[in-house]
């Protein structure tokens, strides 16, 4: 079973959660560009990592060519030979074109770009309820994944905090930016005939079932 997937959707759509669950079921690796960047900037003798760290520390956006290089390097690893689930990339049409070109050199092509559709109000409700333990980093959701004790981490018994990113005004702004920035990428995959839309409000098990149907997965 081979599947090369791109996951698209607003912040709070659950892309990372779905990708992790699908990795458990199918063995297809979940490639989160956020995780790759966090890892690469920690490596002291990685020249590419050093460049990216300097740019991020200046508060600037990492240019496409560096992002592309990082993704290409990760997708060239052995575990991606039979598939991947890309989460957080591509964010621009230029990145989408680069990905297509790279896959072509490997005699591969994307199976599908899966768009998880979640209305703004649902995103706001999900993200503003998110809390994090400042000590261990464990993530909770006051609605869907609450701690056992009121606003205290189950493990550390430390009071949970809300990230600035998860405050309502910021969430609404992030949703607006997502719509503006991602629409061209959605249109790009739609024109190619590989865009698959999934209702991101139907619950995790139903969402997973939809994606498995898209890739023709059978565990028989």
From Swiss-Prot:
The answer on whether this UniProt entry bears the keyword Cytoplasm reads: yes
State the Gene3D superfamilies in the record.
P-loop containing nucleotide triphosphate hydrolases
Q: Which GO terms describe its cellular component?
A: cytoplasm; cytosol
Role according to the record: Catalyzes the reversible transfer of the terminal phosphate group between ATP and AMP. Plays an important role in cellular energy homeostasis and in adenine nucleotide metabolism.
One Pfam family cited in the UniProt record for this chain: ADK_lid
TM annotation in the entry: none
Q: What is the lineage of its organism?
A: Bacteria, Thermotogati, Thermotogota, Thermotogae, Thermotogales
What are the UniProt keywords, alphabetically?
A: ATP-binding, Cytoplasm, Kinase, Metal-binding, Nucleotide biosynthesis, Nucleotide-binding, Transferase, Zinc
State the protein's name: Adenylate kinase
Assembly, per entry = Monomer.
Q: Which catalysed reactions does the entry list for this protein?
A: AMP + ATP = 2 ADP
Enumerate the residues binding Zn(2+).
133, 136, 153, 156
List localization entries.
Cytoplasm
Q: Provide the domain comment.
A: Consists of three domains, a large central CORE domain and two small peripheral domains, NMPbind and LID, which undergo movements during catalysis. The LID domain closes over the site of phosphoryl transfer upon ATP binding. Assembling and dissambling the active center during each catalytic cycle provides an effective means to prevent ATP hydrolysis. Some bacteria have evolved a zinc-coordinating structure that stabilizes the LID domain.
